Amino acid sequence: MAQSADHVLDHLELFRGPEYQQMLADKKMFENPRDPAEVERIRAVTKTPEYREKNFAEALAVNPAKACQPLGAVFVSVGFEGTLPFVHGSQGCVAYYRSHLSRHFKEPSSCVSSSMTEDAAVFGGLNNMIDGLANSYNMYKPKMICSTTCMAEVIGDDLNAFIKTSKEKGSVRRSSTPFAHTPAFVGSHVTGYDNALKGILEHFWNGKAGTAPKLERKPNEAINIIGGFDGNTVGNLREIKRILALMGIKHTILADNSEVFDTPTDGEFRMYDGGTHVEDTANAIHAKATISMQQWCTEKTLPFVSEHGQDVVSFNYPVGVSATDDLLVALSRISGKEIPEQLARERGRLVDAIADSSAHIHGKKFAIYGDPDLCYGLAAFLLELGAEPTHVLSTNGNNVAGENATLFAGSPFGELPAYPGRDLWHMRSLLFTEPVDFLIGNTHGKYLERDTGTPLIRIGFPIFDRHHHHRFPVWGYQGGLNVLVKILDKIFDEIDKKTSVLGKTDYSFDIIR
């Protein structure tokens, strides 16, 4: 049926019409078509153990579950008050970072570039930097411009020298301009997060690139919190703030982007909403300790903080009872504050909920993919629930195998392999040769769900095809309850699907589960 003013079809229905189906069929004739039988034969081969062996033998990334460094750097930068991320690279690169963040958080994502093109990539982009910083400062009036790299790393542009030259030419006058080298062709968004955060702290603590004296640490009782690259940053950071407030702990959240990615619609446009105050960023050097919620997001930042005399503690995405216990014990030990009764009661509620639902989760097999801290945290929680994390895959988790070996050492399921440096094409082989009950990961897993029939539970980044997941915490006891409910809902949905045929399977299509 064609479009008409009386009956407007959206794309979900429009392209099913006969005229569009015929157009798509005709289009295939000009695309070097293959015999459908041969296509199905090859598909069948890719589902076999023999193909899996060849797949894992190849040093090839077909469908990596990671993004590039500058995305993580932009994510960090917007977590500071009045900060505009400035990527020394092309406009297309920045369009990718902005769209990626906007599609996940459903919020505008401010970021600019030096608009490098082919000539600047060959001969250097100094002039692009000078003009770009001047335009950014004059048009958007940021308190801080955080400069990172992308395409410029191919030729090796020196950001520090370029920024100094730009300041000498008057491009930037009053704004602080920290920087970090974040080449897009090595590492991942997690590496970029780490490099950018270290660069910002280094700027404020070590004398603003030689334009101010280095700060001298005067220890106080505050604690710094680093959230890491996190698709649930809005809900998680708010949950951590709530816990710290209940315990009466003075704190600073470094790179606090919980407001900029959840700005209210109230008639006032805010390009920069919330964020860690510039003064608090500098004063964070005086804190008693710094806690990283994600170890592998801060592999360079935490040693830098430690060099300045602070205690440093790291966790791996604290989901569930044991992980939250460890977090609260660490907070209590460092601060000297008691764990309040309210948190003890929340713990009891989570334990009660797990006990209520254990019969439905116990023994279920799960495959997990995503960032290394996320994979570790979810695997630990699944073991806590009595489930089996059969496959744990992290494209950007070089150390996840060793850490998971320690985690699984006491598992009733024995040694469960982890797959660092592997991608979603490897996961496809795993799901066909060693099937599981459920898959946990980001939006890109929906193609694995369609291909292998493994139901997908969406946790991680990015999640494009569902809305507002980022507003709810997955850390802490309350976050553990949210994850538990998400898992149970998918389990019950699958039970309903398999028991809904009248007269055949509906004997178990129950109201009560």
From Swiss-Prot:
CDD domains: Nitrogenase_MoFe_beta (cd01974). InterPro entries: ChlB/BchB/BchZ, Nase/OxRdtase_comp1, Nase_comp1_CS, Nase_Mo-Fe_CF_bsu, Nase_Mo-Fe_CF_bsu_N. Its EC number is 1.18.6.1. It comes from the Bacteria. GO terms for molecular function: ATP binding; iron-sulfur cluster binding; metal ion binding; nitrogenase activity. [8Fe-7S] cluster binds at residues 68, 93, 150. Keywords: ATP-binding, Iron, Iron-sulfur, Metal-binding, Nitrogen fixation, Nucleotide-binding, Oxidoreductase. It holds the Pfam family Oxidored_nitro. One of its GO terms (cellular component) is molybdenum-iron nitrogenase complex. GO terms for biological process: nitrogen fixation. The keyword Oxidoreductase applies. Belongs to the NifD/NifK/NifE/NifN family. Ala-184 is present instead of the usual Ser that would serve as a ligand for the 8Fe-7S cluster in the oxidized state. PANTHER family: LIGHT-INDEPENDENT PROTOCHLOROPHYLLIDE REDUCTASE SUBUNIT B (PTHR33712:SF7). This molybdenum-iron protein is part of the nitrogenase complex that catalyzes the key enzymatic reactions in nitrogen fixation. Tetramer of two alpha and two beta chains. Forms complex with the iron protein (nitrogenase component 2). This is Nitrogenase molybdenum-iron protein beta chain. It comes from Bradyrhizobium sp. (strain ANU 289). The gene is nifK.
